Amino acid sequence: MKKSTLFSIAIIAAIFITSCNNQTTTTTEKMETKTGITKAAWGTTDGKEVFLYTLTNAKGVQVKISNYGATVTSWVSPDKNDKPSSIVLGFDSLSGYLAKPPYFGAVVGRYGNRIAKGKFKIDTAQYTLATNNGQNALHGGLKGFDKQVWDATPASDSTASLELSYLSKDGEEGYPGNLKVSVRYTLTDDNELKIEYSATTDKATVLNVTNHSYFNLTGDVSNSILDHTLMIDADNYTPVDTTLIPTGEIKSVKGTPFDFTKAKKIGLEIGAVSGGYDHNFVLNKKDSSLSKIVELKDSISGRTLEVFTTQPGVQFYTGNFLDGTISTSAGKKINQHAAMCLETQHFPDSPNQPKFPTTLLLPGQQFYSITVYKLSVK
């Protein structure tokens, strides 16, 4: 056979092999956008395996969740120009979370928010908690739910739903009772991230569990959230002292910088609030039914985030303590007001505030709540 003929055959074979390889790559990419859930190893901590789960809906929107802290690490969706980016703060690797950032995307508990001086009573029993926020207990203590490795169970490979469970043992961080808690994340084809919380205990305890995602609808931390417009369906809020513990009062927002009953830019009156917003809003809810409580909009991306919940309150926090010392995985500094939180909850320090809705959970009772974050683009 002539050399030219052999050369031609080699060229044809190379083209065929390349074509096959390209097809394989394309097929893999298509599989990754199918509705469902995938799992990837993400490291170890405390001798336990940590995984990263990717939930994908029919529109290709993806939410990534780790069983470390039951943490939402990213929520990637397209903006009005069809450019995808994540609307929540997070890291690409476990090491970012082990460095103890400010609860990015984590589930916080056993008691989210603050308990004054780390103490409370149930009947005549006095409980003393680990204090990790000055003289107060914050978000469950030194090693709360956000720093635990949870057990994770996908609903199925074809369903974008993940359930995580954790046993908080009696005495953990000072809290009484063996508490079995579970969190189920579901990403719907309507771009809703549903978060369902449930818990039972074998001894009277207190519980206030929430998700601590930091949102920036522009998808870029270089842009402040002060230009986002916000509506909160709350006629009242709970004023706080200098350590951010509620005074026990419930005050009207009317005529104050806390009035978001009609949508306004977050930055419009933030200068009149010492340190920025970090307050609980008393939602206009008569019962525990699921209802819309927040609408957040960004004109740059065209994104709108609606929040629905069964909870009586929401903590609106404008990232006041972000100071540029933490950077994204891409190396961008996360400065003050680079993101904001909308933490659905019972009120801070409720165990010490008899006028607030109770957070007491008794044996034989089952705690259940649901919060839905719905994303849309115009």
Please provide the spans of the model-predicted regions:
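Positively charged n-region of N-terminal signal peptides that target proteins for export
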Residues: 1-6, 21-22
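Sec-dependent N-terminal signal peptides
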Residues: 6-12
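Alpha-helical transmembrane segments and their juxtamembrane interfaces
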Residues: 12-13, 222
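C-terminal motif of bacterial Sec signal peptides marking the signal peptidase cleavage site
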Residues: 16-19
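An exposed, glycine/acidic-rich loop-and-rim segment of catalytic or binding clefts
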Residues: 21-378
